[in-house]
Amino acid sequence: QNPIEQEGTYPLPEAQVDRFMLKVIIDYPTLEEEKLIIRENLAGSLPKVTPVITADDIVEARKVVEKVYIDEKIEQYIADIVFASRYPDRYGLSQLKDLITFGGSPRASINLARASRAYAFIKRRGYVIPEDVRAIAHDVLRHRIGLSYEAEATNVTSEEIISDIINKVEVP
């Protein structure tokens, strides 16, 4: 999604949005980065890009990520986070009940587990810890939580709802 240029585009139905693993927010470059962009662009030279990894390396890394261990307690934690987005009152989050029209689907749980594995891999661990789940939860869930009219009217965001959930759900 490009939040600036939306003319001629249509919002995807919820079921199609749910098929995207992540919704990553990319901000503008910093002032220093933008000055570098200007400088390099005006110089007319394209930066030389040298590969740091091969296609075979990527395939191999994917196999390693699939082997990153997720304990049953972490699976329970992931399921609890997603269930709390559907049934907030069961998790002591009754204040969220009227703010959410729909919560994460089973696909949200699957993708939160997969993304947590990838995050653990990036952190050079062969196992997932709760901090991995918490670190990636916003990217996995922000597009999977439907906001009610009340939430929109009071400027409550999915980011805030996800933060409330991960701060309340018991960590194993």
Each predicted region: which residue ranges?
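Alpha-helix N-cap and coil->helix boundary residues
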Residues: 12, 33, 53, 69, ...
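Conserved AAA+ ATPase small/helical "lid" subdomain
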Residues: 48-112
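Canonical AAA+ ATPase core
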Residues: 1-68, 117-119
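C-terminal engagement/docking regions of AAA+ P-loop ATPases
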Residues: 87-172
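Short alpha-helical scaffolding segments that buttress acidic/His motifs in well-ordered protein cores
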Residues: 37-38, 78, 82, 136-141
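Residues that form generic nucleotide/phosphate-binding pockets
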Residues: 37, 61-64, 81, 164-168
